[in-house]
Amino acid sequence: MEVVKAEYLNDYRIKLWFNNQVVKVVDLANSLNVEVFRPLKDLEYFKRFTIKFNTIEWENGADLAPEYLYKKGTAVS
């Protein structure tokens, strides 16, 4: 499973395109309570993700497994 494209939507929601042609929206608001993710509670920081190693990653090295994002996301038709 790989994230091939990602787009910030609003709040803590990101639209993700996966390598199996599925597009999902994931809301990460409740996923940021672990220490490494706390800086992401700042929305301006949260918005500055990139795709690295087949998933989304932030400047501090925080990332989420693409499988987790896929399972947590809601399919977009």
Residue ranges and their predicted role:
Residues M1-S77:
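Motif-centric detector for short Cys/His coordination patterns
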